Structures are given as structure tokens and as C-alpha cells.
Amino acid sequence: MSRQVVRSSKFRHVFGQPAKADQCYEDVRVSQTTWDSGFCAVNPKFMALICEASGGGAFLVLPLGKTGRVDKNVPLVCGHTAPVLDIAWCPHNDNVIASGSEDCTVMVWEIPDGGLVLPLREPVVTLEGHTKRVGIVAWHPTAQNVLLSAGCDNVILVWDVGTGAAVLTLGPDVHPDTIYSVDWSRDGALICTSCRDKRVRVIEPRKGTVVAEKERPHEGTRPVHAVFVSEGKILTTGFSRMSERQVALWDTKHLEEPLSLQELDTSSGVLLPFFDPDTNIVYLCGKGDSSIRYFEITSEAPFLHYLSMFSSKESQRGMGYMPKRGLEVNKCEIARFYKLHERKCEPIAMTVPRKSDLFQEDLYPPTAGPDPALTAEEWLSGRDAGPLLISLKDGYVPPKSRELRVNRGLDSARRRATPEPSSTLSSDTVSRLEEDVRNLNAIVQKLQERLDRLEETVQAK
């Protein structure tokens, strides 16, 4: 009888640990809109989630440590006139977040360090160029102020947020149908897209050229999602002809056959992939699922190795993924997800069991830091650069907020002027405004009491 050889991996025993009740965000109203995005975005400072709101689209932003029950009157980011479909934090400024909406606009917002004290209605800049709803927003990983948006008009626009102008356009000639997913390569030289026309494309956005294309990576009719992984490969999730969910790994230079194709189950939810380039682990989270599967990608066959699955009782309505610099390295945490329930956001820590409390260098290689490697102008001129790396050995402390400056130049004449955002007010100004509000409330209370006394006098006569 031959012995089965088990592949050695330091991630074989990774396990998921949900946060305790007091470390969750309770009593939040998660959006009911049907759309295949995560509906949640997190960074080392803030947690943001798309929520139900009357009279337009809104999302909630809370300081990361402000857990527990969320007040029903908590101020929201509420400048959109229709439901918000996607949100994304800027990788180079933890106070800046972009949102795409059914109102056909992209808005970029600046959140003060302590969070919002008043509703935020005016964005730093509104980016107008799509003719149908905007379902995807994605920041360039290494170039400052470069933002991509994809709309249901089958158009991808790349914006220079610093000027408020669209600098690149990929029109319906590239994607003739709805775009399901867009992902930047690690150095931002390429994008990978999946489309309703059943094709996955690798595109050089500055030239507008498709450098690789795969027709029907999965035989089913349900949406496909695609992300870049290590060494020029892409990973796709989709469905078989028999509606079984699948995950596949592809070499972009040889797309004829997948390097690996695995069937998972027969659930109907679209699988959202999250890839960690530091560990080469990809996590698969399905909306409507109650589990997170994770796989390790290696450079030798069979390339894609199933590790394990975290399961819970309640299904997820969305999922946020924390950047590596927001993790607790002293607890050997290699990933953290923010699972959206119907009325709650629950952090889930993915941990490698280790006996020592010392920094584990093999788990934490230098990771992408918060500083951009390029300006928007440098990237547009043809330069590419990988992320500027930082060590997490001594922990990571988020820097104080850096103001986002927008210089519209000649473009301002044809776009609506954007007033100074309330989020840039100083703490002294905010304190004065809060005091004014309290004084006004006191005056209103006194007037109400006076009115009540007058009514009693009139009734007595």
C-alpha cells in the first residue's frame, strides 16, 4: 500500500476567526441593490459600506475602531441621486474614497480623520462621462490620483482625479456588452476584464489594445470574474455548462487551456476573488454564501492548491478586504475580511497558527505601502513601476490625512463647480459648528415650550 504524500505548505492550517459581538458593526442597513460588487471597502483607518438610503444613494463610513451598535442617525456620505453600486479606498490616501452610482457619475470624497460629524453631500470632485450606471471603480495601484471606472454603457474611463478629467477611454468597440469585472496588474501596466460576451481580456489601457483574449473561459452563462495573480497569470471564477461553480488559473501567454480548473459546488452566487500577492493565496467569497474558500498558487503543477474553507451559519451580502498594512502582525493575521450581513458587518481574521509572538518574517515579506511610485503624468507618458514596499516588522501606523487637491484648469468651464468639501474643516471649526447646532437646538426647545404655554392659555380662555 503506497503512502499518500501531503504537500508541505505553511498555510495548510490557516483558519478563520470571526470577531466578538462588541468588535462588529451592529444595526447597519446594508444595501438591497442587486449588483455583483463587495458593497464594502476597508483600510487601516476606516470601514465603509453601501447602505439603504431614502432619496438617493448613500454609504456609511466609520472609523475602524468605532465598533458596536451604530446610531440610526449616523451621518452618511449622501451626494449621489441614485443607489451606489461600488466603493473603493484610494491606496495612496486612506482618507479618500471613490464611489460609482446608478446616477451615471463617479464621485471622489475626502473623509476627516475622526470620521463624519455631519452628512457629507459635496464630493471633492464629480467625474461625469458615463451615459449609464457606473458599477465598477478601481484605483491604479502605483500611480497617484489615477482612477478607473466601468459603466453599463460598456465603456471604461481612466481619470486623472487631480484634474477631474477623463484621460483614457476604452469604448464599446473593446467591450460590446456589460463589463463584469476589472482588475489592475500589480504594476498598473495592464488591466484584466471579464465581459458578458463571454470573453476575458488583458488590455494595455494607454494604447487601447487587447494583448490577450480568452473566449469562454467557463462554459456557463453566469457572470465571470477575473483577477491578476502572480507571474503574469490570471485567475477566473465562473460556471460550467451544468451550472457548477468553477475556479481556473490561466497563463496569459498561453490561453488555449487552463493551467488548473476545479469545480466547487452548485451554488448560484457569483464568486468574488481576492488575491494576496505577498502569500500567493486567493480567497473566494460568494454573495449569498456562508463560506470563504482559499487556495494557494504555486509556480509548479498543479499550480492551484485548495487549502481550506471558513464556514459560518449566516450568508454574506457583501465582503470587504483589508490591505496588508491594516493587519495585526503580532497575531499572525494574514488576511481580514469584513462580512456584510443584513444588519451587521462582521470582521473575520484569517490566521496562521504559530506558537511564538515574535514577528514572523516568512509570513510578512515587504508589502505595498501608502506612497505612490508614479505621478499620473509619469504613468500616462508610458512609465511603469511596482508598488513602493514597506516592512511591517515594527507595525504600521497610518499617517495623518493628506488633502486631495483638484486643479480643473480649463476643464472647469464645462463641469459644475465643486465647493470646498465639509470634510476639510479644521477640528476647531467643527467644534464651533457643533456648539452652534447645540445652541440652535436649545433655542428651538425654548420656542417650543413658549408655544405650548401660549396654546394652553388660548385653550383656557
UniProtKB/Swiss-Prot annotation:
WD repeat locations: 13-63, 73-110, 123-160, 164-204, 207-251, 258-296, 302-349
Positions in coiled-coil regions: 425-461
A cellular component term, taken from the record's GO annotations: actin cytoskeleton
Modified residues (Phosphoserine): S2, S412, S422
Keyword Repeat: yes
Modification Phosphothreonine, positions: T418
SMART domains reported for this sequence: DUF1899, DUF1900, WD40
Residues covered by region (Disordered): 407-431
Domain of life: Eukaryota
Biased composition (Basic and acidic residues): 407-418
Any GO molecular function: actin filament binding
Alphabetical list of InterPro entries matching this protein: Coronin, DUF1899, Trimer_CC, WD40/YVTN_repeat-like_dom_sf, WD40_repeat_CS, WD40_repeat_dom_sf, WD40_rpt
Keywords of this entry: Acetylation, Actin-binding, Coiled coil, Cytoplasm, Cytoplasmic vesicle, Cytoskeleton, Membrane, Phosphoprotein, Repeat, Ubl conjugation, WD repeat
GO-annotated biological processes: actin cytoskeleton organization; actin filament organization; calcium ion transport; cell migration; cell-substrate adhesion; cellular response to interleukin-4; early endosome to recycling endosome transport; epithelial cell migration
Function: May be a crucial component of the cytoskeleton of highly motile cells, functioning both in the invagination of large pieces of plasma membrane, as well as in forming protrusions of the plasma membrane involved in cell locomotion.
Family under the similarity heading: Belongs to the WD repeat coronin family.
Protein name per UniProt: Coronin-1A
Naturally occurring in which organism (per UniProt): Rattus norvegicus (Rat)
Lineage: Eukaryota, Metazoa, Chordata, Craniata, Vertebrata
